Amino acid sequence: MIMYDQVGCGKSSLPEDPGVYVKETWAEELVALRKFLHLDELHMLGQSWGGMLEMYYLTSFDPQGIKSVMIDGSPASIKLWVQEQHRLIKYLSYEDRAAIAEAERTGDFTNVKYLAANDRYMEKYCWDDPDENSPEPLRRPTNGKRASLIAEGPNEFTENGTISDFDVTDQLHKIHVPVLVTSGTDDLCTPLIAKSVVDHIPGAKWHLFANSRHLALLDQHDEFIHVLDQWLAAND
């Protein structure tokens, strides 16, 4: 199993040049990684942005040797993602909705009321703030916030970065490898978002994790590992 930190995060380099943080960079990085490690055949699993990168890679680079793909909690369209995030915001308290609306209106994402509202939003649909009982990877220092800010934007519902126009929905028909889409019932990646991916990939399958937010691997760990094991065994 190979896991890697993309350029701009983790232990990889953190370039100052904002022009680096575009989808093309990360796709070319994946191409280079496969070549360097001689990964002629492989299974791929991408979570959130990782799944978006998979879709872009598969539809734009015509890669060979892909035995199967798992797309976990990822949109094919940022426009649909933003629409769904604003729908999810409606389930927050009036005070939190107002704080988020004011931040989006003014462009000020430093206000303490907004920050608290966004924290509650992420806890509801993504994952809790890490504590001493959280899995070790979540307790590591976070490197790469600048890359996320440049590529995505200040949060999940104000997408104004370099990938704000990301939309490969009409290209998904080009994918002709086994694909499993996964998502949670209480996920930032709503069932509508996940279904929009499944419906456009020939033969794609979908597993919906009950009572799971954006990190199904953590919310439904045993079920997630079981689904992954079965998927790999069926396509290896």
Residue ranges and their predicted role:
Residues 175, 181-183:
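Short beta-strand/loop motif that positions the catalytic acidic residue
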Residues 67-108:
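Flexible "cap/lid" loop of the alpha/beta hydrolase fold
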Residues 188-193:
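Conserved alpha/beta-hydrolase "acid-adjacent" motif
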Residues 2-49, 53, 62, 226:
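Active-site loop/oxyanion-hole signature of alpha/beta-hydrolase fold enzymes
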Residues 203-236:
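Catalytic active-site module of serine/aspartate enzymes centered on a nucleophile-bearing elbow/loop
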Residues 9-12, 77, 215:
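Active-site loop signature of alpha/beta-hydrolase-fold enzymes
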Residues 104-162, 171:
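Conserved alpha/beta-hydrolase catalytic His-Asp/Glu region
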Residues 40-84:
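Conserved hydrolase catalytic core segment
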